[in-house]
């Protein structure tokens, strides 16, 4: 079976809110999300079974992870263990990549 190559420019941008949009690629056990957050965008407190790595390519995010405030800036990576409550706010217009393992099945089920 050939190894699939995904092109971000061929993946539809999914509008989550007026302030947040994303593109998703999935494998068998992991998911990669390209996420765009406008300054002031809020990701509410939540937790999931997936381990998460967030790599900020441009901008900055303020996270609250299990009660600890963490600022993640361009070029930095945040690891969030599975099951850990967290929320985020975009301090600037932000472009970031999220890796989830296992796949966030709840994201695939969304309309």
Predicted regions and their residues:
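Glycine- and acidic-residue-biased ligand/ion/polar-headgroup-sensing regions
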Residues: 50-61, 66
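Short acidic-glycine-tyrosine-enriched beta hairpin
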Residues: 67-82
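Structural motif
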Residues: 31, 60-62, 69, 85, ...
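A cytosolic small-molecule/anion-sensing beta-strand core signal
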Residues: 57-58, 73-74, 92
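Conserved short histidine dyad/triad with adjacent acidic residue
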Residues: 33-47
């Amino acid at each position: 079976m050939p190894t699939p190559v995904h092109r971000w420019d061929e993946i539809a941008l999914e509008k989550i809110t007026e302030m947040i949009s994303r593109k998703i690629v999935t494998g068998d056990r992991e998911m990669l999300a390209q996420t765009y957050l406008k300054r002031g965008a809020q990701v509410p407190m939540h937790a999931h079974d997936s381990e998460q790595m967030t790599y900020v390519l441009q901008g900055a995010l303020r996270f609250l992870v299990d009660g600890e405030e963490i600022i993640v800036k361009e070029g930095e990576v945040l690891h969030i263990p599975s099951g850990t409550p967290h929320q985020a706010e975009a301090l600037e217009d932000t472009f970031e990549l999220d890796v989830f393992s296992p796949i966030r099945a709840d994201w695939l089920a969304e309309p």
